Amino acid sequence: MKTFLSAVLAVCLFALPVSAQNGDDGDSGRSLPRMASLRSKLVNARSGPGSRYPIEWVYKQKNAPVEIIAEFDLWRQIRDWEGSETWVYKPMLSSQRWIKMTNKGTSSIYAKPEHDAKVIAKVEDQVIGKVEKCPEDKDF
């Protein structure tokens, strides 16, 4: 049930816009864009790909989901759940997929992706959940 719940959360609650780079390969040889998450509870967001660039802000939520949209050496340009774009150091990212509830208030989680499905949980804003398995017809 946890697997399905995580997949439903991913489908319903965290859909980032697809970049124009769709299908391109980055410096790493992996396709762009792709999903990742923040590895640490403190991650510096920089204005460019290098430590010489100023810190714009600091992410303070471990496992928060992000979309990698560009690569340069050991730096990754990411888009976060609010649509902000910045650069982070590659070791601060994880390939594990997590989702983040971004609806204000409490939202329902359903047993199946159908309009008449049973509500199995209530989730509050800013809750993070691990994606254990995606539905076969979806790729997140």
Q: Over which residues does each language-model region extend?
A:
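Sec-dependent signal peptide recognition
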Residues: 2-10
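N-terminal signal peptide c-region/cleavage motif recognized by signal peptidases
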Residues: 15-17
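Beta-strand-rich domains and repeat architectures in extracellular enzymes and scaffolds
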Residues: 54-55
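SH3-family beta-barrel domains
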Residues: 20-47, 58-62, 69-74, 79-84, ...
